[in-house]
Amino acid sequence: MTLTSPFDLTHKTIWVVGGAGYLGQATVKQLYQLGATVHCIDLENRTADFISTLSPSSRLIAHSLDATDMTATEEFVKYQISTSSVPDGLVNMTASTTALKMEALSADDFDRVNHGGITATFMLARWVGEQMAARGSGNVVLFSSMYGTVSPYPEVYEAPMNKNPIEYGVGKAGIIQMTKYLAVHWGAQNVRFNCISPGPFPNPTVQQLHPDFVGRLSQKSPMKRIGRGEEIASSVAFLLSDAASYINGHNLVVDGGWTVW
């Protein structure tokens, strides 16, 4: 008798949107290592640069796409499904922000960020989700943030760092509710929706240039450290796997305990 690990993703096709970012790269690598065929989807230069660092493989496919462009995204979904298949999993890790203080934020700024953070996320989830529902199976992981649940500590964001802006947190709070709604809407069709709320995961550039900021983040965590990229990647892999087959509508908080203070 051959035992198969519930975490094995062999024969699964997974789209990772935002796959060339800091957390996206770790996620693409993890899913690939677990046997999945991974479509890494991101802006043109980011995708090409990242994929060029990896060993060539038929299970690792790069795509260039601005996921905030609704026309391009809908065409991408239709083309990929018509020429290949409906993916088994969709991971949307995209995010944007103005990095502006609240007093300087215009209505257009707010709307632009949340078009990408909420509207574009919803439309992609709907376009792919309805195809998964028609097939009778699927798995979607969206990305929120600890700042979709709590407000930033002002003292952490001393100059030159800008406090995490309001439009980002508002959008990430919306992702949590979107996840719950879609989980109910398509649950009977065996399509699961979950989201992940990362805690402090500053990218390598921030870690290198702003060690004092990283230190303040670490002190606010009960574990007294920032997160590592692979800790998000393994959380994504878990939610996509059969080990999580009865988890639906859940917001998995991966923050080292930040939000339990």
Give residue ranges: language-model regions:
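Short, small/polar-rich loop/turn modules that mediate ligand/substrate recognition or access, typified
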Residues: 187, 192, 247-249
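Conserved NAD(P)H cofactor-binding loop of Rossmann-fold oxidoreductase domains
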Residues: 93-99, 257
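Catalytic loop of short-chain dehydrogenase/reductase
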Residues: 141-174, 179-187
